[in-house]
Amino acid sequence: MRRRTTTLVTLVAAAVAAGIAVPALAATSSSGVPTAGPADTPGSGQSVIDWNRQLISILGAPNVQPGTVHPTRSFAMLQAAEYNAVVSITHASPPYRSAVPAPGDARPDAAADQAAHDVLVALYPSMRDGLDTQLNGELAGIPDGQAKQDGVGVGAAAARQLIALRSSDGSSAPPAAFVAGTGPGDYRPTPPKFPAPMYTGWGSVTPFLLDNAKQFGLPAPPPVSGAAYAAALNEVKSLGRDSSTTRTQDETVAGKFWSATPVWTTWNQVAQQLVADRHASLRQATDVFAALDLSLADTTIAMYDAKYQEHVWRPVTAIQLGATAGNPDIVGDPTWNPLTPTAADPSDPGAHSALSEAAATALTAFYGNHQPVAITATADPGVTRSFDGLAAAADEAGLSRIWAGQHTRIDHQAGQQLGGQVARLVLGDLHQPTTG
C-alpha cells in the first residue's frame, strides 16, 4: 500500500549554491534488506557520490548544455567509466564491454576518481578547472606510492576506452526531420507555443547495452477510435486539466513536483542517499550507479525510438481536437489546457513512467522494495514526497503525468513495461541480482 505525505521543507543548501532545483532523499534502513558490510575494496562509496553530484552541478550551470536528454548519456558514461576502472582491478563483476589492463596492486579508488574526472572533462571541457580541483582533493586522501600511480593509469585508460566507445554513437547527429501528421491520433506540435518536436533522432543513438533500440518491442497502442483510448483520454481530460475539480490537492502537488526537475536527476539523487545511508563500499557504489544510469540511458534511447515510431498525439491535442478523432466517446473541448506545459515529443510511451520504472527496478535489485524513501524538491513551495518503497515512488512519478495532463494511462503502462525490461537486461549483463 502506497503512503504519500506532503510537508514543507527547507531548500537544500547544495542545490541553492549550485543555482539549480534538485531533489534530495532521506532513506530509512529496512531490517529486511542487508546493510553494506565493511569495504571490500580500498576507498568508499562517498567519492562516487561526489562525482555524481558534480555532474548534476555542471548540468545546472548556465549555458553548459541546453535542455535535452543528453544528460542520460553523460551519467551513463561517467558511471560506466568508474565501474570499469574498479572491476578491471578487482574482477569482482563483469566489465562493461571489456576491461582495461590493470596491475594487481593498483588502487581502485584512484582509478575511479581519475576515470570520473577524465570523462567529465571530455564531456564538459569548460569545467576543467573545477574538475581538476575535485580530482586533486579526492586523490589527496589516498596514500602516495606505486599503487596510487597505477590506479590513476587504470582510470585514465578506462575513461579513454569509454570516450572512444561513444565517440560515434550518433548523439551529436543533427535531429532527424519529422513531418507532423494531420490524421486522428497523429502527433503534431502542441499548444500554446507549438514548438518543433524534440529528440527526433535520439532513438537512433547507439545503446549502451541493448542490441538495438527496438530490442523490446512494445505492443501497438490502441486505436483512437476505440473504447480503450476514449476511456484513457477521458481520465486525463478530467484529472489533468489546469482547473480540474476532480483532481485532489495531493495529486496537484505531485503533478507539479515531478515536472519540476529532470526525472533522471531525481533518481540519481535517490541513489546517492541510498548509497550514503548504507555506507556502501567503492565497489558497491560503482555497481549501483552503473546499473542505474546504464538503465536510464538505454531506456531513453528505446523510448524515443518507440515515441517516433508510434507518433501518438498528446492529450492536449486529442482533447482540443476531439471532434476529429472519429470516436463517439470523445467530446472535444478547445478550451482545455493541462496542469503543466506539454513536452515537445509524442505521447506513447510516457517518459516519466519508463525512466522511473527503469530506475526503481535497478535500485530494487540492491536495496529491495521495502526501503522507505522521501524525495525532496526545491521547487516553490518545497515539498517532500514520501513512499513505502521504490516501486511506489516510480508508480507515482508515472501517474503524476496523468494528473499533470501530459499522458494517458496507456502511455504510463507502456512506459513501465519498457523501463522494467531494459533495467532487467542491464542487471543481467552486469550480473547483478534481480527481484520480482
Describe these PLM feature segments.
Residues 27, 33-436:
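Acidic/polar surface patches and capping/hinge elements
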Residues 1-29:
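Secretory targeting and sorting signals
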